[in-house]
């Protein structure tokens, strides 16, 4: 369940015991042998002895209650060592002492008080100093800034997440603008490329072809039962970097870290998953450190059967209200999966729907600067994949709702260019299904420049994944027939961006309204400083996810995406516009996410898709109260 602010305050005032349930949540199912084994341990645990001893002697209780078996265990282990037989990996049932310091959910580093150190057998296991959470954040930031490369900072942050979860999230929330590029894009792309080399402690859950027929058992191995948000990838299209196979795990791990830090979703209800069906990346297949299956990527029936088993197992094990976010699937699977499961599961594709929602928000905000409506603009895209067609469809949908015109007519305002040129009606026979709605009557054009000159768009959007394709002549052409050309260079990472912020402002003589997918530094042009907006999906998906969770939504509806876009656009202020930015600053992202969550939840209640009844009277306040707050708790 989501923590509430009230509960967080109560928790900080009322000490709690750092329970550790043997590596599995108490409700977790397992094989008959394991259940028998745990039941035997419970029978030996002698409740009367537990009540007879002081509360702080929990570890002593465990030792007393199992004293009768200690010699037996030692004999078994000695025999196993000599005979090379398997041994039972014994673990304490309460996080205390050495174990507590290595439990990321309960570890507080040097913030354990003197009383906690005595009560939980930490005396001598820590240096004498007691440092507050705030001071530990200051210390870690000082260390982080001394690293020379973004990847070093990424590794340090991931190590912190695996050792002190609350410090990790507090650090990220308090320094979100500085740390976001290291936790997610663009650094996460390099991390995925080198994931095998930097792999330490495993994060998330791996489902592979080896698990076919046993996916439900794999899900049961995860220690938490109350999962509400899953981010899953098959690693075939990681950012703009292509097929990284099993090493794509960095994406769902990073994505869910942002669900928590930016959207306030409790980390214990989040589950990152990678589905490993092989890879066609020859470099990885020949890399001795590659962590995935060493085989070509499965396709067709074999692939579909594993995905179907996975989706069925998730719904069976976690219920209908668990959000499944598809992440970085290749085009040929992404659209099919979204269409197939959107009617039976709570599913969301960030590459298609999340990108579209944040770009639509940027356009709505940009129109506040230039005037006019969505229907009065002409849109030209470079790139016709998941992102490009997803954005185009949401724009057409919003135009349709604003004008009451058929969506087929509204699509005619939007033009797309792919690797073969302008998508036109004469190409329909060779087009992929998701491109066909955008094939309009026009003469064939081979280049983006020709398309710009012919169509004369007011909005130019790049989702091609190919860097430096918005050339000087293209931006100058855009500026020649638009007083304020709107230019979105959305491809990630930075090296793949269609143009830089400096190029957009310089080549348009400071007149363009610019946004990018990757962050760019402020640009000075003729005495004015422009702060480029980052059209980052992280503006949308954390708040969207929170809204779905707090309302108990059972399906994602397109109207929820439109509501999220409008809520984000409303957060941009005149002060942002004067600096050239169409997005609000990330420093207020939790406030932004609360408003987006409220808008999404409100739409869920309006559409009859919410199950948490009755609806709260103040959805914004309710969303804020439901947000996870990563402050250290006191332990009794």
Curated annotation (Swiss-Prot):
Pfam families: malic, Malic_M
Positions annotated to bind NADP(+): 380-396
Cofactors, names only: Mg(2+); Mn(2+)
Reactions mediated catalytically: (S)-malate + NADP(+) = pyruvate + CO2 + NADPH; oxaloacetate + H(+) = pyruvate + CO2
Amino acids binding a divalent metal cation: 327-328, 351
pH dependence: Optimum pH is 7.5-8.0.
Enzyme Commission designation: 1.1.1.40
Effect of residue 544 to F: No effect on kcat and Km for NADP. Increases Km for malate 2-fold
GO molecular function: malate dehydrogenase (decarboxylating) (NADP+) activity; metal ion binding; NAD binding; oxaloacetate decarboxylase activity
Localization, UniProt: Plastid, Chloroplast
Entry's family note: Belongs to the malic enzymes family.
Protein name, UniProt field: NADP-dependent malic enzyme, chloroplastic
Organism per entry: Zea mays
Name of encoding gene: MOD1
């Amino acid at each position: 369940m989501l923590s509430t602010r009230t509960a967080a305050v109560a928790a900080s005032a009322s000490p709690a015991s750092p329970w550790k349930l043997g590596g599995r949540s108490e409700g977790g199912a397992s094989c008959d042998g394991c259940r028998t084994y745990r039941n035997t341990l419970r029978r030996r645990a002698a409740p009367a002895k537990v009540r007879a001893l002081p509360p702080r002697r929990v570890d002593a209780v465990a030792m007393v209650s199992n004293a009768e078996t200690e010699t037996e265990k030692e004999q078994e282990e000695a025999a196993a060592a000599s005979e090379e037989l398997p041994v039972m990996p014994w673990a304490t049932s309460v996080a205390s002492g050495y174990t507590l310091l290595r439990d990321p959910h309960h570890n507080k580093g040097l913030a354990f008080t003197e009383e906690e150190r005595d009560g939980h057998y930490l005396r001598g296991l820590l240096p004498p100093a007691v440092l507050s959470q705030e001071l530990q954040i200051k210390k870690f930031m000082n260390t982080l800034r001394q690293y020379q490369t973004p990847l070093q900072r990424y590794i340090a942050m991931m190590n912190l997440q695996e050792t002190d979860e609350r410090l990790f999230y507090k650090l990220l929330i308090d320094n979100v603008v500085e740390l976001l590029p290291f936790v997610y894009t663009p650094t996460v792309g390099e991390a995925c490329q080198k994931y095998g080399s930097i792999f330490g402690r495993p994060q998330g859950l791996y489902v592979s072809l080896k698990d076919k027929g046993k996916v439900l058992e794999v899900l049961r191995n995860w220690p938490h039962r109350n999962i509400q948000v899953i981010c899953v990838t098959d690693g075939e299209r990681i950012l703009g970097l292509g097929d990284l196979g099993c090493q794509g795990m960095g994406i769902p791990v990073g994505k869910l870290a942002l669900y928590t830090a930016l959207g306030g979703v409790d980390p214990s209800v989040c589950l990152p998953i990678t589905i490993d069906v092989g890879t066609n990346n020859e470099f990885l297949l020949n890399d001795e450190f590659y962590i995935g299956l060493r085989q070509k990527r499965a396709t067709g029936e074999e692939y579909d059967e594993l995905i179907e088993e996975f989706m069925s197992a998730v719904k069976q094990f976690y219920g209908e209200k668990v959000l499944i976010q598809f992440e970085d699937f290749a085009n040929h699977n992404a659209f099919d999966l979204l269409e197939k499961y959107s009617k039976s599961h709570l599913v969301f594709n960030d590459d298609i729907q999340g990108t579209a929602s944040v770009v639509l928000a940027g356009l709505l905000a940009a129109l506040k600067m230039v005037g006019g409506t969505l229907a009065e603009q002409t849109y030209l895209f470079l790139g016709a994949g998941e992102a490009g067609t997803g954005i185009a469809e949401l724009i057409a949908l919003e135009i349709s709702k604003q004008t009451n015109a058929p969506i087929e007519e509204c699509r005619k305002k939007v033009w797309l260019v792919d690797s073969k040129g302008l998508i036109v009606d004469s190409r329909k026979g060779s087009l992929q299904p998701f491109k066909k709605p955008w094939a309009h009557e026009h003469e064939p054009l081979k280049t983006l420049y020709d398309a710009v000159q012919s169509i004369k768009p007011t909005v130019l959007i790049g989702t091609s994944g190919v860097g430096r394709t918005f050339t000087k002549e293209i931006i100058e052409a855009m500026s020649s027939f638009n007083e304020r050309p709107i230019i979105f260079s959305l491809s990630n990472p930075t090296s793949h961006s269609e143009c830089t912020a400096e190029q957009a402002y310089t080549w348009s003589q400071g007149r363009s309204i610019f946004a990018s997918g990757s962050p760019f530094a402020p640009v000075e042009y003729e005495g004015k400083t422009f702060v480029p907006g980052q059209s980052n999906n992280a503006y949308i998906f954390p708040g969207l996810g929170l809204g779905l969770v707090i309302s108990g939504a059972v399906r994602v509806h397109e109207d929820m995406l439109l509501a999220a876009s409008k809520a984000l656009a409303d957060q941009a202020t005149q002060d942002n516009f004067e600096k050239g930015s169409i997005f609000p600053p990330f420093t207020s992202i939790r406030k932004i996410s609360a408003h987006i969550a409220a808008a999404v939840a409100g739409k869920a209640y309006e559409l009859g898709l919410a199950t948490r009844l009755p609806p709260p009277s103040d959805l914004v306040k309710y969303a804020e109260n439901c947000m996870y707050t990563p402050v250290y708790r006191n332990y009794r």
